[in-house]
Amino acid sequence: MSTAATVAGAAAMAPLLSACGGGSSKKAAANTKEGLKAALPAYVPNTNAVKPDIAPVQGGSDAATDAGYLSYPASPPASVSGVPGKGGSYTAVTPLWGTAPPVGNSFYQAMNKALGVELTMKPADGINYSTIIPTMTAAQKLPDWINLPSWLNANFNTGGLVGTQLADLTPYLSGDNVKKYPNLASLPTGAWQTGVWGDKLYGIPCFSTSFGIPGATFYRRDVLEARGITADQVKSADDLMNIGKELTDAKRGVWAFDDVWTYLQTAWNVPMNWRIDNGKLVHPFETQEFLEALDWHYRLATSGYMHPEALAGDVANGATRFYSGKSLIGGGGLGAWNLGDHQSGVAADPNYRRGAFNAITADGKGTPVIYMGAAASMISYLNANLKPAQIEELIAVANYLAAPYGTAEYTLVNYGVEGVHHTRVNGVPTFTDEGKKDVQATTFPFLAAPGSVISNPGGEQVTKDYTSWSAANVKYLTKPPFWGMNFTMPQALATAAAAPSVNDTLKDCYHGKKKVSDVQDAIASWRSGPGERLKQWMTDNVLDKYGAGQ
């Protein structure tokens, strides 16, 4: 499996904003440059980590690819000595998309024994998490430990919770203080930044990465290569359009494209959220690049090269179309590139192989740009009512949960007890029936987790393909304005930032139902009201006070 976060891929494309209503509750401001530096934990590489088969490749802007592993360690080494807990009793809430494990199951019991605490896991429905948590915060009844996904900061008003209902971890983890916890100290600095509000550290990152790319334009590598088409032949938008013509055969029910707008627009250098020109904020909707990208996608939608179901807005069956070869090119989050995808694809077509095009520029000239998304989007927090000794106990537990890939602790957290929850099949930890029922990736790892790695035991080619593509593209990563910055925005402006009326028209345009001029009209209406207010607020409250975070 890939331990890169497979949830919230699109969330990586947004600033880590929180929203507040019109009340007078305390709200955390953004971070100052000096305050952020003081709050962040020191970074110390983990000497207990298992050596990867494919080493990370460094890029610019603090970017680096995730390490790759082609097999699971036969004898997982320990990264923690002794038992971290001291017998405390706590509750924890994490979002769960799926069936909740039985209460008090054997995996929970094994974890509590290893952790030295009585940690009662209370996974909550992930689909309704955005409404479940505000009910808790309104009653001021948060659990001792909770996961608050950053893409829901606006729903939760996280900026209003830090320091009031959520504990300040700065005294325990900032600077060299984190060195007491080697597994936590090895997490990327950018990931810790997602949990800093108002120059204080509150959050513990899960599934962190220095390769925070929201997604890519994927293609059926097996099909295209059989037609003599390789990824390095695609250097411009025209190249893609020409391939679309070559691959589409409507009579056989094959179309070249599914939806590609979300992750392809950067080929025109459309900004992620904002651009700064001569000290002034410019929204993507205001740029010529946005209109040029949209024009190309409108022409694609009306070319006959896009699958009719995609044009009709059918997202749910996109993977099925891709696996069956009915559509051959489509955008998606990087979490799709994993062993499960390979297994589903091979079940539909034994020759199935996923590939991704390298970053391109629309005109085939110059250097491509890939805007970095957040280094972590799953963040956990501790309750402000906890005593210092309790906070220290749970941080020690978090250090255990953050044990690197392939260690003894990682194996227990992710696979349970060998012989009970998993057995080794060809060297790969494989769940038993009890393990399938009890061990959930969205429970303990949503409280703390190691940095992401790429590993697909039994699907080594997937790991090789993914890491090869990552290595070829990491040099294009760059941080957009306000990268990793947390700030509290009025609810009305958070809605303005989402621009639902524009995005509805935009979607109709890249599906060929409305013209570019219709989108321009929607943008003009948005700019004249909420758009201008949003820009002014961002200028006055973030850019002028704290800079762009770069």
PLM region spans:
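N-terminal export signals
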Residues: 1-20, 329
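Bacterial lipoprotein signal-peptidase II cleavage site
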Residues: 20-29
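Short, well-ordered beta-strand elements
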Residues: 85-98, 117-122, 145, 202, ...
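Extracytoplasmic "Venus flytrap"/periplasmic binding protein-like
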Residues: 113-190, 196, 222-228, 232, ...
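Helix-loop-helix "hinge/cap" segment bordering the ligand-binding cleft or interdomain interface
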Residues: 196-263, 276-317, 321, 382-392, ...
